[in-house]
Amino acid sequence: MKLHELQPAAGSRKAPKRVGRGTGSGLGRNAGKGEKGQNARSGGGVRPGFEGGQMPLYRRLPKRGFTNIFAKKYVSINVDRLNIFENGTEITPEVLLERRVVSKVLDGVKILGNGNLEKSLIVKGCKFSKSAIEKIEAAGGKVEVI
């Protein structure tokens, strides 16, 4: 086989739908828009959520809740992600960011207790779940809670 003999896989290349180019094409005359009406006109159609004039669903349902602008957003990781560090390493949110364990530190890092920890580490400047504290201390590490 040579480069000039290469063919695309059967069915992978589809011809574009050329509408309004004569009746012989099968998409002439009304160009797939049917007969008259709002949708046949240029710029026709209704806006999203419009239900023909009846009260739309988004207005029938009550508003609920609010966004607390003071809420703290924490990036959460599990203790098994800390196994990449050497024994005795001091871990802070900055170190986690530097080693790409987390992609960003929002209002802080919270360490959760899923998985197993084999390394003895000193973890500072984070929030912890109870199970994470137990697992870090069981592995011989230290926890400094903020």
Curated annotation (Swiss-Prot):
Query: Segment Disordered: which positions?
Result: 1-54
The portions of this protein that span the membrane are none
In terms of Pfam families, this protein maps to: Ribosomal_L27A (PF00828)
> Can you tell me which residues the record assigns to a coiled coil?
none
Return the GO cellular component terms, semicolon-separated.
cytosolic large ribosomal subunit
- Give a GO biological-process term: translation
Q: Does the keyword Aminoacyl-tRNA synthetase apply?
A: no
Q: Mind listing the UniProt keywords for this protein, alphabetically?
A: Ribonucleoprotein, Ribosomal protein, RNA-binding, rRNA-binding
Q: Which GO molecular function annotation, any one, does this entry have?
A: rRNA binding
Q: So what family is this one in?
A: Belongs to the universal ribosomal protein uL15 family.
Q: How does it assemble?
A: Part of the 50S ribosomal subunit.
PANTHER family noted in UniProt: 50S RIBOSOMAL PROTEIN L15, LARGE RIBOSOMAL SUBUNIT PROTEIN UL15M
Alphabetized HAMAP family for the sequence:
Ribosomal_uL15 (MF_01341)
What is the name of the protein in this document? Large ribosomal subunit protein uL15
Could you tell me which species this protein originates from? Clostridium botulinum (strain Alaska E43 / Type E3)
Gene expressing this chain = rplO
